[in-house]
Every structure is written in C-alpha cells, then in structure tokens.
A protein has these predicted regions:
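Short, small/polar-rich loop/turn modules that mediate ligand/substrate recognition or access, typified
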Residues: 177, 182, 240-242
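Residue(s) in the substrate-gating loop at a strand-loop-helix junction
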Residues: 145
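Active-site helix of classical SDR
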Residues: 125, 161, 169
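C-terminal substrate-recognition "lid" of short-chain dehydrogenase/reductases
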Residues: 125, 137, 218-247, 252-253
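Short C-terminal tail/terminal secondary-structure segment
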Residues: 1-5, 96-99, 150, 230, ...
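Alpha-helical segment proximal to the catalytic Tyr-Lys
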Residues: 130, 174-175, 238
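Canonical Rossmann dinucleotide-binding motif of NAD(H)/NADP(H)-dependent dehydrogenases/reductases
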Residues: 3-37
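Catalytic Tyr-X3-Lys loop
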Residues: 91, 103-122, 137, 141, ...
Length: 255
C-alpha cells in the first residue's frame, strides 16, 4: 500500500518560507493538498514562492518579521486561524557574522539569533496554537538543528536556542495533545542553502570536507526534510507527537 500524505482542506503557515528549506516545505504541503501562507521578512521572496505554487487559493504571501510581536499580531489578523504551523524561520550560529567561541562573544552577538531561533517560535506559536486547541485539530512542526542535540564548537548560542525550541515543543505536545493538536520537531544538520550553498559553489572542497562527517557523504538538500514535515502535518500523523525527528544524513546516531 502506498503511503498517502493527505493535508487536503487544511490551511498552513510556514515562517521563513521564502527560500531554502521553507520554500521546499511550502511545495510539499501544497502537493499534499494544503493551502499555504508563505511568510518571509522579504515580501518579494514570499511572493515568488507563492506564485511558483500557482498563487491563491493554493499559496499566498504574508510579509512579517517574526521577531516582532506586533508584526506577528498583524500577520495573525491577515491570515486568520490556521490548521498547520511550521516554525521554520531561523538564522545560523550567532547570526550572519563570523563564528566565535562563546567566551569571545558579547551579549549583542546573541540577541538576533535568540530572538529568531527561539523567541519567534514562542511568539508565533502563541499567536496561532490557541485556535487549534479551540477547534480540536492542529499540527505544529518546528525546524531545529543537531546543534541543539550535541555539543559543537562555535555553536553555543545557536545550540542553546535550538535546544530551547525543542524543550518548548515537547512540553507543548503534552499540553495540547488532549485537544487533538500534535507538536513535533524536525532536526537538520548542514543544509545546502543560503550562505553555505554560496560557499560550496565558490569552493566545492568546502562541501566535500563537510560531507565527510555524514554517513551519507553529502550535505542536506532543502527537499530532504520537506516530505517528513508534510507527513507530520497530515491526517495520518495523529498519534505522532512530542518527538524530535532527525533528517541529518546520520550525523547524530542515538536511541
């Protein structure tokens, strides 16, 4: 029997959906029958993804900075309640600057990464999950990182934020489960997106060196986690909750 991922009739919001993994998730959800709000801080990116999915009613762009509670409130007014929330928006390490050991950082180095990688998960979830509970159905998936599952140099702040997001989601699952709402995480490793994709394009040796850390001997592609996210958001995943599912090429092997 073929596995059917069915999100028909459901409305989803994907934060950070304007490129990379977020865009791939939007495509997977629409393919599974959902209609999707594509969120991004850059309106043109969100619009491009929505247009690539055929536009309304299949996909609509919604611009918002998800580190701002006020802009999240406005986004919630625009989208209305949703059935599916994918917390995907995030930034690497301590932002987009140079990698630093924790003892060499200053608090201002942490703030952007913590606001987006943890704070946005809390604020966006708070804005949307209550309506799921009231309606008796919902799916929440947060994209996290193996940096929150194992200790690595230069990852103290990023790892702390992602571990915090995981802890939040596990507790959320316990709270909202009786109302028919599930909450799960998908943990990624090095993905060929954004800054890393640009670096690998300039110097393929960077990708080769990183890939040696993975049993699959390659970096992740944006499409790798998308099907799993769609599955977790589907009707058939009603007994899958409170878990962290790795899509990491075997980078972290653990019970």
């Amino acid at each position: 029997m073929a596995l059917e991922i069915d999100c028909s009739g459901r409305t989803a919001l994907v934060t950070g959906g304007g490129n990379g993994v977020g865009a791939a998730i939007c495509h997977a959800l629409v393919a599974a029958g959902a209609s999707v709000w594509v969120n991004d801080i850059i309106e043109d990116r969100a619009t491009a993804v929505a247009d690539s999915l055929g536009g309304a009613p299949h996909a609509r762009p919604v611009k918002a900075d998800v580190t701002s509670p006020e802009k999240i409130r406005r986004m919630r007014e625009e989208t209305g309640p949703v059935d599916i929330l994918v917390n995907n928006a995030g930034i690497p390490t301590t932002g987009f600057g140079e990698l630093k050991l924790f003892v060499d950082t200053a608090p201002e180095d942490w703030e952007a990464a913590m606001r987006l990688n943890l704070g946005a998960v809390l604020h966006v979830s708070h804005a949307y999950v209550g309506a799921m509970v009231d309606r008796g159905w919902g799916r929440v998936v947060t994209i996290v990182s193996d940096a929150g599952r194992r200790g690595e140099r230069y990852q103290a702040i990023y790892g702390a934020a992602k571990a915090g997001a995981m802890g939040f989601m596990l507790s959320l699952a316990a709270e909202v489960g009786p109302s028919g709402v599930t909450a799960n995480c998908v943990a990624l490793a090095s993905m060929r997106t954004g800054i890393l994709a640009d670096a690998v394009e300039r110097d393929p040796a960077i990708g080769d060196r990183l890939a040696r850390a993975y049993p699959m001997r390659r970096l992740g592609e944006p499409t790798d986690p998308a099907a799993l996210v769609a599955l977790l958001c589907s009707e058939g995943a009603s007994w899958m909750t409170g878990q962290v599912y790795p899509v990491d090429g075997g980078y972290v092997s653990a019970l």
